[in-house]
Amino acid sequence: KGVLNGQDLAGWEATYEAPLTYHYAGLEIGKCGPWSQGPVQLQTLALLNEMGVADWNPVSTDFVHRVTEALKLAFADREAYYGDPDFVKVPLKQLLSREYNRERSKEISDRASLELRPGKISGFEVRMPEFDSSGRGDERFSAMGIGEPTVSKKGETRGDTCHVDVVDRWGNMVSATP
């Protein structure tokens, strides 16, 4: 017994949307919108660009540290600001702006941060989920079964999504995030 049934699939229609893009190192990088995690990669590139990543040794510990810290900041902003733009206002212009990422990049030091540090964007409220730093976990999810981590043995879900890309030998491709 799965989570989807025939009616779910019969009523579904594919949609098309323009990708969210960022120009980096002469390339145009395209990702899905803020209903996905796509903008995290774009913001990470924006942060690294502001810090001069092109001049770093890509096999150095400093490179790995700074990329990791940039990812932490971008993921913190994802937690605070992302959502489906059909339902919430998402400050994408600010999150990907040069000015915002220049200021955010100054938060990266030689020491690893253990804090979840979303940035502050004028006119937008930071919306953070509850976070248990003790590592005990949430009892509500102790009944989850093997396989898809968000589905309990009873077929109940907690609302997460999944993503699949399929390319066949003829070059036909589908990319779906339900």
Predicted features and spans:
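Internal maturation/activation junctions in enzymes
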Residues: 2, 53-178
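Long, well-ordered, tryptophan-enriched scaffold segments
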Residues: 1-29, 34
